[in-house]
Amino acid sequence: GGAESADAKKKKKKIPKKPSYVGAVKCNGSCHDAYYEAWKVSPHGNTFNLLKVGERAEAKTRVKLYPEKDYTTNPLCLRCHTTGYKQRGGFKPAGSKNKKGKDVSSTIDPEEPNKEQVGCEMCHSVAGGAQMRVVMKNTKGDFAKADTEKYGQRWDYANVCTRCHTHPK
């Protein structure tokens, strides 16, 4: 067994070491349509909207923010009010550019919320990559808890929630 040929190496599928965020819209149109529709009108499905000028003025004032200010590009806010901010495949605010200067800002569609809100992946697991492919192939949905953990499902909800739900009152 010598070294692999260049052609053989190219044929091998590359599976990213770190999964990439895919967004809540990937859950819609699959087995989770009802969950997606319920999420869209839930508090998590509207977190980014709270950062806009004039939204939740009383709550912003209570935590010493300015209701007339736009917080939709503020990094401190985006880490909890979006999906995967500053992570692979995660939300990119308006004005985001890649190394070549190309605009890579996330698309925002009010009719089909996605990474600009707190989506499924923020609580359950990052869905892109090898993990998602394995889960999607098992259409029976009969995973044991250990299997779901192996593919990234989070069960320590108290720790997951407190990453964001510790904002001062």
Model-derived segments and spans:
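C-terminal segment of classical bacterial N-terminal signal peptides
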Residues: G1-S5
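Short beta-strand-alpha-helix junction that forms the catalytic/metal-binding core
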Residues: G119, V160-C161
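Sequence context of c-type cytochrome heme-c attachment sites
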Residues: A6-Q117, E121-W155
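Solenoidal tandem-repeat scaffolds enriched in leucines and small polar residues
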Residues: C161, H165-K169
